[in-house]
Amino acid sequence: MPSIEFDDSKPSWADQVEEEGDEGSLPSPKETVKGNIKTVTEYKIDDDGQKFKIIRTFKIETRKASKAVARRKNWKKFGNSEYDAPGPNVATTTVSDDVFMTFISSKEDLNAQDQDEDPMNKLKGQKIVSCRICKGDHWTTRCPYKDTLGPMQKELAEQLGLSTGEKEKAAEPEPAQPVQNKTGKYVPPSLRDGGTRRGESMQPNRRADDNATIRVTNLSEDTRETDLQELFRPFGSISRIYLAKDKNTGQSKGFAFISFHRREDAARAIAGVSGFGYDHLILNVEWAKPSNN
C-alpha cells in the first residue's frame, strides 16, 4: 500500500474548483463587502478550456439623489435582467464618471466677438466717416435718426427759404464778371479781360491737383458722385471728383478719380479707405498717375 503524504501548503483555487464540482461546472460568483469596499469574485472558462478567476473591487460611495432618481432605482427589472441584484450589472452596464458640461461661450460673447471683427467698428475711432444728420461715426444711410431728424432738418431749411444746395452756393463767392465793353469798339484779345493770364493748362493749380489726385477702383455699379463725396469728405477739402460712367447705361465703370486741395489729405484718404469694405466690395485706393497733357 503506497504511503500518502500530506501537504500542509495552501491548495490552489483551481484545485478547489475541480474538487467542488464536476468537470465543466463553475462555482457561483461571490460578493463580499468590507466597509466601503465591495469585492466580486467570478469564475470563467476561456476558449482553451482553462478556468480562470476574475476579481473586481468597487468602492462604495453614498450620494444624495433626487426623489425621481430614487424612484427609478426601485423599479422592477425585466427581460434578461429580471433576476439581477439591485444596482447595475457589470455584465450589461458600464458605470462611468459623471461628465459636467461647461458652456464657455454665450450669445453675448459671440456678439462681442462679431463686433470686434467688424471692420466698421474698427474704423469708428479713425473718424473717416461722418453722418450728415447727427454727425456720428456712421454712414448717413445707416443713421438711426434718419427717419426723425432728416425730415425735421428739411422742414427747417424750407422755412428758412434755403435748401442745402442753395446754402453751399451762398457760401461760395461768385466769380468776378468780366468787364463788358460799353463803347462797342473792337478790343484785341490780348487787351481783353484775362488776356494777360496764362492758359488753364499752364496754371500751377492744375499741377497741384495732379499731385493730390487719387484713383479709387473696385466700385459698384450703383456708386454715385454723392457717395464718393460723402466717403472722402472727412479727410479734407475736395477740389473735384470724376466718376467713370457707361455712356449707354449711365452706371459706374468701377473706378473714379478724387482730387484734393492738399496732398496730405489725399495721403490720409489712401491710408483710411484702401482695403475698406463699401457696398459689399473691398475698395482699392492708390495715387493716380499724372496726366501727360
Curated annotation (Swiss-Prot):
Pfam families assigned to the protein according to its UniProt record, in alphabetical order: eIF3g (PF12353), RRM_1 (PF00076)
InterPro entries: eIF3_g, eIF3g_N, eIF3G_RRM, Nucleotide-bd_a/b_plait_sf, RBD_domain_sf, RRM_dom
Assigned keywords, A-Z: Cytoplasm, Initiation factor, Phosphoprotein, Protein biosynthesis, RNA-binding
Single GO MF annotation: translation initiation factor activity
Gene Ontology annotations for the cellular component aspect, listed alphabetically: eukaryotic 43S preinitiation complex; eukaryotic 48S preinitiation complex; eukaryotic translation initiation factor 3 complex
BP GO annotations: formation of cytoplasmic translation initiation complex; translational initiation
Biased composition (Basic and acidic residues): 194-206
Residue ranges annotated for the RRM domain, each copy included: 212-290
Region annotation Disordered: where it falls in the sequence: 1-32, 163-206
Places the protein is found: Cytoplasm
Lineage top rank: taxon: Eukaryota
Disulfide bonds: none
Quaternary structure annotation from Swiss-Prot or TrEMBL: Component of the eukaryotic translation initiation factor 3 (eIF-3) complex, which is composed of 13 subunits: eif3a, eif3b, eif3c, eif3d, eif3e, eif3f, eif3g, eif3h, eif3i, eif3j, eif3k, eif3l and eif3m.
UniProt family annotation: Belongs to the eIF-3 subunit G family.
Function of the protein: RNA-binding component of the eukaryotic translation initiation factor 3 (eIF-3) complex, which is involved in protein synthesis of a specialized repertoire of mRNAs and, together with other initiation factors, stimulates binding of mRNA and methionyl-tRNAi to the 40S ribosome. The eIF-3 complex specifically targets and initiates translation of a subset of mRNAs involved in cell proliferation. This subunit can bind 18S rRNA.
Name of the protein this chain belongs to: Eukaryotic translation initiation factor 3 subunit G
Gene for this chain: eif3g
